[in-house]
């Protein structure tokens, strides 16, 4: 309790942004849980909030990730709204989806190439951090950033297993943000970790049956 009082007694812009990020994150999570296309709108707003926060705390890879989030949000919205190829594959054209992409499983044929791409991203981001920044946590920062990039792509493809990728990211980020003294964001990611399990189960129920 004393720690909470101390936290608010020295209220700063970074702490205010930390709280704003918490609220936006909860809204985003609810929309993702419901598989609502509007999650991509929040995905454009959140990077502005979190980008400042991560830069202020020296999480440079996470800061760079926010630029990717904005671009991925545009791509994700387009994929969910207008892609029809997998709707044809799953014979889900008769469902009331208004042309939106259906939820499907992560194809086994993509596991190996996506894994290799993820490892390559991790290595490149790690090298960038240790070469050009003063990051104190380059290994964890680069890992969560690389895996987040893969997970966000999987979300744009509307694969149910994207939740499992986020489960790993969120668990690691929770510990990382506690270490970096960003308590509200740490609490948000702890909640994300739990919701990733529930979200995965929810999305499995939404996969079209043939």
Please name every model-derived segment.
Residues 43-96:
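Hydrophobic/aromatic-rich structural module bridging two neighboring secondary-structure elements via a short loop
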């Amino acid at each position: 309790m004393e720690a909470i009082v101390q936290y608010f007694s020295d209220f700063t812009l970074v702490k205010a942004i930390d709280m704003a990020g918490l609220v936006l994150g909860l809204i985003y999570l609810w929309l993702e849980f419901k598989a609502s296309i509007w999650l991509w709108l929040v995905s454009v707003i959140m990077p502005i909030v979190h980008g400042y926060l991560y830069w202020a705390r020296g999480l440079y890879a996470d800061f760079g990730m926010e630029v990717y989030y904005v671009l991925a949000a545009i791509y994700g919205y387009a994929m969910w709204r207008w892609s029809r190829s997998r709707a044809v594959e799953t014979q889900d054209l008769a469902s009331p989806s208004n042309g939106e992409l259906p939820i499907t499983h992560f194809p086994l044929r993509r596991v190996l190439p996506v894994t290799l791409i993820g490892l390559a991203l991790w290595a490149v981001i790690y090298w960038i951090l240790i070469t050009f920044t003063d990051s104190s946590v380059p290994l964890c920062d680069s890992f969560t950033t690389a895996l987040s990039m893969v997970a966000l792509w999987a979300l744009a493809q509307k694969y149910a297993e994207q939740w499992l990728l986020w489960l790993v990211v969120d668990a690691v980020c929770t510990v990382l943000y506690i270490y970096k003294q960003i308590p509200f964001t740490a609490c948000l990611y702890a909640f994300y970790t739990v919701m990733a399990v529930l979200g995965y189960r929810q999305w499995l129920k939404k996969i079209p049956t043939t």
